[in-house]
Amino acid sequence: MSNTAEFPLLSLIMFTPLVGAVLLLFVSKHSENTIRWIANGFAVLGFLVSLPLWFWLDQSTSDWQFVERLSWIPSIGAEYFIGVDGFSALLILLATLMGSIAILSSWTAITERVKEYYIFLLLLQTGMIGAFVSLDFLLFFVFWEVMLVPMYFLIGIWGSTNRLYSAIKFFLFTLVGSVIMLLGILAVYFYHHEVTGVYTFDITRFHELNMPFDLQWWVFLAFFLGFAVKVPMFPFHTWLPDAHTDAPTAGSVILAAVLLKMGTYGFIRFSLPILPEATQAFVPWVVWLSIIGIIYGALVAMAQRDWKRLVAYSSVSHMGMVMLGMFALTPVGITGSIVQQINHGISTGGLFLLVGVVYERRHTREISEYGGLSKIMPAYAAVFLVMTMSSIGLPTLNGFIGEILILQGIFVVNKVWAAFAATGIVLGAAYMLWLYQRTMFGTVNNPKNEGLADLSLREFATFTPLLILAVWIGLYPKPFIDRLDTSVDRVMARVNSTYAPLNAGAADEDEAEPGGGDLLAQIDGETTGDGFDRLVRLPVRGGSR
């Protein structure tokens, strides 16, 4: 079911950055300040027009909302079909916010080919939003591929020393995964025609398919390779540290905060609901790869001497935690996985911004080059402290909420898996606290650091929304979780045929398994006895309990 929009809000959100990019084509490349003002103006406008998604989203319905539908390529059944639920709405808000912050952070950092730089950033913004709103699989794939081009040029032109190598590596890894994913899309497309006689790329119809297990298995593998590269999961992660290290600050921020979420979004939106039986069969494999990623990413991060590379490997570890929660296949685990995606975008995006601040001043990312910065840049040190604590999951900050939900979701499925996940959290705290101690505390041994300027008003403005969100989600996550309930219910109804949300109206409590409605209230009220067990314990193949 879907609610058709009377006003094309999603198209407005999606194409606002594109309008800005087109407008920049007509501005002289020598008018650099004009270019910066236009790019920042359209980025902020894109965020402002996306805010109605927060206020107008109907949390009581599982229908797709703000739907727009037009015929696109009727000969093959492709449509301009877009819409959102709570999950995609939150990711759109994250994309528009982080895009605005990334563009603002580039004001003084980019001095060459300024016009092209901002055009690529705005095109990237349109591609990200388009992927999150697409309900037509071919349309989704088009936007998925569109994102590759601007990011390739952002790394290859405005990156650091090994930018060409990193850009090509990023492009090839993602392209290979995309081609394999396309084969899976076509398999679902032709199977749908075989059983219904209708050619369509309609994702909502694909969610209703009951494909044979053998076909599900192969399609899941194709989707897995496409999405796992994007997450990235171990062992498909090797492009990420290079891309992060050599990308300009804005590129790293968008890559960490939004682009990595394309992979996890794909799993939740496509793999789990379209291929439920194959999903359950692959659970042990995905979980163990996630656990390896959590531990491996943390251990390698501890060995880094490059500030940016350390944060890059922390992303491998954190996204492994996201995948672990997702493939617990429990309402709490999936909810925690989505919340942690938002949290990772906030904290890791903030950390890359912080690296960019000192790199712009010193043009080095070597951790050994710094020390005692809290004495010279107290405001910077304070912001870095909050982002560090957010990243390691300190209670009262956003990272804690996602991690505790994931651990709750995975614990009753398999306690060994939960123990490995907890180990990753401890290691994460170790390398982040080590980084903070090495860079912020001690004496200022390097004379080049003595004259470093603290955060400017513009720089502090880029961190302000991230600080607010880190505290808001940490203290009161309910508004975010409430917006996810129906999205999680839709996925759970497919991966578990016996699942029923609380708001399904079951006559007897034992007839319904909690998971819908107010998830936090359920956890508060059912953390003992059979209540909590019903909330998180769901049948999953291949996992011991």
Residue ranges, per PLM feature:
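Transmembrane helix-loop-helix hairpins at membrane boundaries of multipass inner-membrane proteins
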Residues: 1-9, 23-119, 194-210, 510-540
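C-terminal ends of transmembrane helices
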Residues: 21-32, 99-111, 153-162, 231-245, ...
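Predominantly late transmembrane helices and immediately cytosolic-facing juxtamembrane segments
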Residues: 234, 348-352, 418-451
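Juxtamembrane/interfacial segments at transmembrane-helix boundaries in multi-pass membrane proteins
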Residues: 57-79, 179-237, 242, 267-285, ...
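Alpha-helical multi-pass transmembrane bundles of energy-transducing inner-membrane proteins
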Residues: 30-32, 116-123, 128-215, 300-313, ...
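Cytoplasmic/organellar membrane-interface segments at the starts of transmembrane helices
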Residues: 377-380, 432-545
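Helix-coil boundary and interhelical linker segments in multi-pass alpha-helical membrane proteins
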Residues: 1-4, 129-135, 268-282, 322-342, ...
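Central hydrophobic cores of alpha-helical transmembrane segments in multi-pass inner-membrane proteins
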Residues: 11-26, 40-53, 94-106, 124-126, ...
